[in-house]
């Protein structure tokens, strides 16, 4: 792997006008991009097509925050992989803990979605992470293994060669009141995730860290041997914040 992945999901934030302003500012700063970093942005569904169009002349990948596994049908309120491809998207975020907690997402449904994403040429960004209860009871490693294996369980041998990303987001570390994991703790968990994924896929795939990433901890995190990128929340919802973290990480990566 030659690149670090650093991107942000906006969750349920930004109007179309706000999304356009962010994308235009990111495009305007494109000349200062680092060749060592693959950037990505995941807007809400209502802005993905426009954001992708604005960033089409750059290397920034654009994604969606969820999708259904079916191509079409009676799934009121859902978005299909074909619809994402129609928007020219590159990535789809799957299995976020908020979807698992509030919308009934399971390891089974994440697996179905991962297979559908790969089948349609989308890069699945698979979110996994243990709760505080899991961590305190010593079940973190077991929970993460279950989530990794579940996410990859529907892939054929050929599909296992597709581009796949994981994002380790400990549930207790994300959100407005989240407590960032220490770099050592995150790196240890990510080593476990990478090992399990490698046992299934027979190759190493990138694993990003997400969970209260900010300008104060991004450099320490990106320097860890098993952290292949950062999945940023509110610290990157302002384009200046995103560009700041990108610049800090680029300097750190080049120094290493």
Swiss-Prot record:
Pathway: Carbohydrate metabolism; erythritol degradation. It holds the Pfam family TIM. Keywords: Cytoplasm, Gluconeogenesis, Glycolysis, Isomerase, Pentose shunt. It is found in: Cytoplasm. InterPro entries: Aldolase_TIM, TIM_sf, Triosephosphate_isomerase, Triosephosphate_isomerase_AS. Its EC number is 5.3.1.33. It comes from the Bacteria. It catalyses: L-erythrulose 1-phosphate = D-erythrulose 4-phosphate. CDD domains: TIM. It is an enzyme of class 5 (isomerase). Its main location: cytoplasm. The keyword Isomerase applies. GO terms for biological process: gluconeogenesis; glyceraldehyde-3-phosphate biosynthetic process; glycerol catabolic process; glycolytic process; pentose-phosphate shunt. The keyword Protein biosynthesis does not apply. One of its GO terms (cellular component) is cytosol. GO terms for molecular function: triose-phosphate isomerase activity. The active site is at 96 (electrophile), 169 (proton acceptor). Substrate binds at residues 175, 212. Belongs to the triosephosphate isomerase family. Homodimer. Catalyzes the isomerization of D-erythrulose-4P to L-erythrulose-1P. PANTHER family: TRIOSEPHOSPHATE ISOMERASE (PTHR21139:SF42). This is L-erythrulose-1-phosphate isomerase. It comes from Brucella abortus biovar 1 (strain 9-941). The gene is eryH.
């Amino acid at each position: 792997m030659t690149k670090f992945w650093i991107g942000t999901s906006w969750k349920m934030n930004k109007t179309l006008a706000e999304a356009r302003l962010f994308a235009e500012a990111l495009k305007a700063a494109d000349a200062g991009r680092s060749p060592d970093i693959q950037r990505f942005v995941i807007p809400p569904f209502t802005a993905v097509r426009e954001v992708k169009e604005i960033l089409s002349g750059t290397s920034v990948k654009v994604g969606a925050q969820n999708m259904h596994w079916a191509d079409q049908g009676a799934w009121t309120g859902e978005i299909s992989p074909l619809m994402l491809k129609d928007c020219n998207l590159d990535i789809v975020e799957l299995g976020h803990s908020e979807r698992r907690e509030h919308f009934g997402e399971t390891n089974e449904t994440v697996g179905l979605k991962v297979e559908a994403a790969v089948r349609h040429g989308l890069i699945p960004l698979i979110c996994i992470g243990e709760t505080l209860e899991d961590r305190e009871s010593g079940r973190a490693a077991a929970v993460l293994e279950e989530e990794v294996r579940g996410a990859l369980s529907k892939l054929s041998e050929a599909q296992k060669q597709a581009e796949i990303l994981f994002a380790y987001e400990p549930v207790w570390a994300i959100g407005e009141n989240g407590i960032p994991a220490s770099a050592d703790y995150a790196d240890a968990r990510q080593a476990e995730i990478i090992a399990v994924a490698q046992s299934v896929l027979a190759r190493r795939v990138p694993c990003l860290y997400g969970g209260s990433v900010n300008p104060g901890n991004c450099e320490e995190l990106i320097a860890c041997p098993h952290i292949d990128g950062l999945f940023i929340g509110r610290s990157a919802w302002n384009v200046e914040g995103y560009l700041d973290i990108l610049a800090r990480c680029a300097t750190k990566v080049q120094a290493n």
